Amino acid sequence: MSALAFRERPPAAEPRGLLILHHGRGTDERDLLPLADVHDPQRELQVVSPRGPLQRPGWPGYHWYAVPRVGYPDPETFAATYSALSEFHDELWERTRLGPEQTVLGGFSMGTVMSYALGLGRDRPAPAGILAFSGFVPTVDDWVPELQSRTATHVFIAHGRNDPIIGVEFGRRARALLEGELDVEYHETDAAHYVDPAYLPAALHWLERAAPDPSGGDG
């Protein structure tokens, strides 16, 4: 059984898919759950938000890995969290009977990094979508993105041009890396390091398209 704590927002009826939200640095599993009702107002998705496994000296909340340099996670803590999240996702798919092809991995900041890592890792199954707010595709030892087998994966990237924490160039690099192989939708606003409400209507529309419809439609 995975050791990661989590919170869950159940669907109103039989879910059409699964949305896993990974919080940012220094918060916890409660932080992104309010986005569930924004992105899925009809409560058609099972929504789960795990808690990062690390606490860092001098920081509040929880973290996914140590940060020696933006863009380059600490290899040791990254690898441990990658393994823990892999186990968490696998157990969640077994419990909910919703597979990776019905799953959107989402996150903010450090949580986006882990969504990219688990969604693009060569030893992990391809998800239906990746919802990426203000993050980056990591550069880290022993991890490389595998793109050619993920051409059906939808990616939504949103990044603020005035982000002082993770500069907008990281969002642009992710777009450049992914758009040749995956279905990428990209947005920028003048926001700093937060989820700009201006992104949300487009994200809602994207999620309806990315999350599969059990009736056989496009979702």
Label each region the model flagged.
Residues 32-35, 143-144, 167-177:
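Short alpha-helix in the alpha/beta-hydrolase fold that links the catalytic acid
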Residues 105-107, 133:
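Short beta-strand immediately N-terminal to the catalytic nucleophile in serine-hydrolase-like folds
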Residues 157-159, 163:
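Short beta-strand/loop motif that positions the catalytic acidic residue
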Residues 168-219:
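C-terminal catalytic histidine-bearing segment of alpha/beta-hydrolase fold enzymes
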Residues 1-102:
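Serine-hydrolase catalytic machinery in alpha/beta-hydrolase-like enzymes
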Residues 125-137:
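A conserved short beta-strand
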Residues 34, 117-121:
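Active-site signature of alpha/beta-hydrolase-fold catalytic machinery across serine-
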Residues 107-111, 115:
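Gly/Ala-rich beta-loop-alpha elbow adjacent to hydrolase catalytic centers
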